[in-house]
Amino acid sequence: MNARLAVAPTVGLRARRPLAPLPAAADALGGAPSAPSSTASPATKLYPNLDLDFVPVMTPAEWARGLALAVFTGALHAAFVAKLFTQRLTGGSSPWYVTVAPTLAVAVLTFAIHRYLALEEKEQRRLVSETDAADPDSLFTNVDDVTVHYKLRRPKKGPPRVVVSCCHGFGANTYSWERCAMSPLAEALGAAVVAHDSPGFGLTARPTDLSKYLPKTNGAISRAMLDVASVAYQSMEQRTVPQSPFPKPRRVVMGHSMGGIAAAVAAGAGDVDDVVLVAPALIPPRLGVKPNLNPNPKPVSLMTALCGALGRFATAVAVYALAPFLKLFLRKIVRSATFWRRGLSKAVGRRCAPVFFTDLTWADGYRRPSCVKGWDDGMVRVVLAAATAGVNDVWAAESAKVAAAMRKESPAVDAPEDMSTDAAATLEALRCSGARVLIVHGDEDAIVPLENSRRLADALGPEAQLVVMRGCGHMPHEEDPDVFVEAVKEFVGEWNPRPTVRAKKP
């Protein structure tokens, strides 16, 4: 392996500072939240103004109306069948099963529709806007026609020497960074640290354009957050000023899990000094092989390209057709505290699992977006974009492969711009960007295998460094932020000497 490898020990779980619940209000410019509690109760409410456990139920009057509608429509259907289909077609009475079975089906369907509409009305009434669900330290800005929610932390003293943009993983939001890592990173690096919600998650807007949910858009947002962080030391009223009187700080992008794809895309566009990938999902486990970074790969056969085009187009159609059912399924699981407690406890290492399961504030931090209007539509669009990249984008990409196969050329030659978010092209752009890469991975990660990061570090070459955190699972920056911050500080500090040293030079 060409990359450097380091193994970070894990300190005792009980001694860790960040296991205390995060207060709803924190100082956006000053760094750490004020007066955090040292213990967390399972009954602690992180967002007392939001009804995270709301479950819509029908009132007795609504039940009565539903049953009455079911009986009425069933009777109408029975009369319709008896008169139009039986007497006119056969001249006699119909068997009971010809009338009763369809009538019952119509009655049940009518009641189901009534129940859905009644519960949907209650569901929509309890949802709030992104700004109503925001924290006092929440900030919003517009990037590429998307209103992006983000959190900001900066060092308590002096202008930032480093600016950091953090991208969360699938199903998460800024909470995964702000609870444990943002303030310590700001102090350790002397950095302005920004974490944003990706489109479809958290409190960021959920546009109808599926291209806004692709990694290229999230990468553009990550780069925009670097610009926001660059002027973070100014007053909040002047944070949008495009220029700073201070020298340009070092630019760092971080990405956890699927957020690592956005971080890699952001760095691949250039003007990024360091990249920190935390349990990155850049190389899917199903591939089982090293990514092909050859800019001129072996041409794809015509049959393979055609099958791929038809397969992805069929997938797009199927996902669109199943979207309403997917929304109902997401509502069932995402709002459940039990779902998050079990999921988070399985995602982390063995020693952290009891804390993530018993402390309800962790689950609340992840499921808060389920109180925002349109959150389920956003999740469906995320899945649609991931599965199809949009029907038009799928067809364009696969058509390019077919055309290249017919010419017996490399598909990479004529691939559209969206194909740059493919793993191979993204990694190639990252490798050629000149940015140094730190990969942090827990040795108990059950979601993204550690071997994936080993192969990724090997593929990126000597500029990549792999740090393995013992006893951590898929979320090492949340499980052991002290060790994580120390690893990042050592990595960034190698090329970022303190400004006081540089100031002494004439």
Walk through the language-model features, giving the residues of each.
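Active-site loop/oxyanion-hole signature of alpha/beta-hydrolase fold enzymes
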Residues: 59, 154, 189, 195-254, ...
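An N-terminal hydrophobic leader/cap segment in hydrolases
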Residues: 90-140, 506
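Flexible "cap/lid" subdomain of the alpha/beta-hydrolase fold that forms the substrate-access gate
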Residues: 91-98, 102, 114, 213-215, ...
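Conserved HGGG/HGGXW glycine-rich cap/lid loop of the alpha/beta-hydrolase fold
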Residues: 146, 152-205
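Gly/Ala-rich beta-loop-alpha elbow adjacent to hydrolase catalytic centers
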Residues: 255-259, 263
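Conserved alpha/beta-hydrolase "acid-adjacent" motif
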Residues: 446-452
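Catalytic active-site module of serine/aspartate enzymes centered on a nucleophile-bearing elbow/loop
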Residues: 454-455, 462-506
